[in-house]
Amino acid sequence: MDFCFMIFYNSLSGQKEQFKPIEANKIKMYACGVTVYDDCHIGHARTYIAFDVINRYFKYRGYDVTLVRNITDIDDKIIKRANENGESTTELVERNIKAMHDVFARLNILKPSKEPRATETIPEMVAMIETLIKKGYAYQGANGDVFYRVTKFADYGKLSKQNLEALQQGSRVDVVEEKENPMDFVLWKMAKEGEPAWDSPWGAGRPGWHIECSAMSKKLLGDTFDIHAGGSDLRFPHHENEIAQSEACNECTFANYWLHSGMVKVNAEKMSKSLNNFFTIVEVLEEYHPEVVRYFLASTVYRSEINYSKENLENAKASVERLFNALRDIEPIEVNLPDDASEYEEKFIKAMDNDFNTPEALAVLFSLAKEINTLKTTNKYKASGYAYLLRKLCDVLGILFTDIEEYFKQGDGADASEIEKLIAERTQAKKDKNYARADEIRNQLQQQGIILEDSATGTTWKKG
């Protein structure tokens, strides 16, 4: 495939740019991962589905992708929550990592190439901090904590497009006497009694949040890599601080491209626990199928805000069912691809090559679905070729990953086990020649949107 014309918005430059990897046909990408102090929420799903789609698209375009997505497994929030729960930080972290992996798998998010934990990279963090101190970019305060000296880094604010003076004036950072400047941030924090701690030249303590990502990306991707990704809420101060640390330490560009995913709003309001509109992924999946949730979160351009509402989820559900229905009763066969199928794929690529425009890409999929539905009764051979292409392109977006009939059986309405019981009762009623009861059961299921199909081998069902 042609590698020349992919463009996307680079938060660092503030404009769309043609993508040029450091090494031909290879991409090194880092995505800030979850701080595992609590269950993952719908905002996490938005971010990691957005970057999963991008990762899948890079691979579809032929790139060899190394995606590093870290786990922050030591943090003030983790210590606080573990103390509140009366458990160790290890117990809390391990439980939440497992829960994260479980919900990400349900949403069909691919595993990253590498998934480092912050606690596995402590020596590299210490080494970076030592280098920053030697170069004059860091200092130790009176209480033992080590801070980054932001005034030393001339480019501070280049990602968030703010100069240091403006940041200082608008700063809500708590005044800490040990800091030379209110904007200085912690690199190494001295441990209090009973807290997890690691040895360092400055005393037992733990790393600051920002240095964790700088050290993990350096260790696994090198001093300079292609793409750094994360939620737009991390742009400042986290990503700004990563740049300051890494570029001061390594004396080279940190990441060439920065991708930031848009935030989730709930009924047009900011999602927050205080507004009682905060939803975990598990809570959302109790009401909607993973296919619907993934489609909904992937259907908006990755860097735009997305509005979480029942209406939008119901629309996503209808869209998923339209695509699944197109693939019903037709076997996708690659060798049956029509000559003009390439036109659909080219339109799909054109959409995704332009800043990963998933709404336009999905429009292509619905055009394909319409073509398949038209051809089902007139040219099944051609329809099966188009069905193969639809499946292929859906896989690039990570949608339609469930077996078709299983999806419809898991939809709203009667429980699958209850349906099977009623079908068994209906089968017995027919054997007993109690046709009135058999018809009654069929009608009962039909009212719940369940269609029965009788054959010589038995009765199957699907959601209509």
From Swiss-Prot:
The UniProt record lists the EC number as: 6.1.1.16
Q: Does the keyword Ligase apply?
A: yes
* Cellular compartment(s): Cytoplasm
Where on this chain is 'KMSKS' region (motif)?
A: 270-274
**What Pfam families does this protein map onto?**
CysS_C, DALR_2, tRNA-synt_1e
Provide the alphabetized UniProt keywords.
Answer: Aminoacyl-tRNA synthetase, ATP-binding, Cytoplasm, Ligase, Metal-binding, Nucleotide-binding, Protein biosynthesis, Zinc
Q: Which GO terms describe its biological process?
A: cysteinyl-tRNA aminoacylation
Assembly, per entry: Monomer.
**Which residues of the sequence carry a binding annotation for Zn(2+)?**
32, 213, 238, 242
Q: Which coenzyme or cofactor does it need? A: Zn(2+)
- Location of the motif 'HIGH' region: 34-44
Q: Quote the cofactor binding remark.
A: Binds 1 zinc ion per subunit.
- Which family is this protein grouped under? Belongs to the class-I aminoacyl-tRNA synthetase family.
User: What protein does this entry describe?
Assistant: Cysteine--tRNA ligase
Task: Cite the NCBIfam families for this sequence.
Answer: cysS
Record-listed ATP binding positions: 273
Recorded GO molecular functions are: ATP binding; cysteine-tRNA ligase activity; zinc ion binding
Q: What is its main location?
A: cytoplasm
